[in-house]
Amino acid sequence: MDFFTWVIITAGFGMAFGSLGTAIGQGLAVKSALEGVARNPGASGKILTTMMIGLAMVESLAIYVFVVSMIILFANPFKDVVLELVAG
């Protein structure tokens, strides 16, 4: 396989693993928040506000992974170096 095929595969795996980690993190955060609201309904406003802030921070991971994948796919900072090494 050539360099560009590996770039596409790597970007795809990066997005897959980054999205998987984000989904698991968000699921655990929502689960914990719902358990907290079930135990203490009076604190639901505080719990949900804190959960939303936490979810925004977790979601930033997915955004960073997306940005890095797009840079690897389209800007491709390593293209010239790798093509020189391959060309000899």
From Swiss-Prot:
Bilayer topology term: Multi-pass membrane protein
Q: Where is this site: Reversibly protonated during proton transport?
A: E59
Q: What are its GO cellular component terms?
A: plasma membrane; proton-transporting ATP synthase complex; proton-transporting two-sector ATPase complex, proton-transporting domain
Annotated localization: Cell inner membrane
Q: Which CDD domains match?
A: ATP-synt_Fo_c (cd18121)
Matching entries from InterPro entries are given as: ATP_synth_csu_bac/chlpt, ATP_synth_F0_csu, ATP_synth_F0_csu_DDCD_BS, ATPase_proteolipid_c-like_dom, F/V-ATP_Csub_sf
Q: What does this protein do?
A: F(1)F(0) ATP synthase produces ATP from ADP in the presence of a proton or sodium gradient. F-type ATPases consist of two structural domains, F(1) containing the extramembraneous catalytic core and F(0) containing the membrane proton channel, linked together by a central stalk and a peripheral stalk. During catalysis, ATP synthesis in the catalytic domain of F(1) is coupled via a rotary mechanism of the central stalk subunits to proton translocation.
Q: What family is reported?
A: Belongs to the ATPase C chain family.
Outline the subunit composition: F-type ATPases have 2 components, F(1) - the catalytic core - and F(0) - the membrane proton channel. F(1) has five subunits: alpha(3), beta(3), gamma(1), delta(1), epsilon(1). F(0) has three main subunits: a(1), b(2) and c(10-14). The alpha and beta chains form an alternating ring which encloses part of the gamma chain. F(1) is attached to F(0) by a central stalk formed by the gamma and epsilon chains, while a peripheral stalk is formed by the delta and b chains.
Show the HAMAP family listed in the entry: ATP_synth_c_bact
The protein's name is: ATP synthase subunit c 1
| Organism the protein comes from | Syntrophotalea carbinolica (strain DSM 2380 / NBRC 103641 / GraBd1)
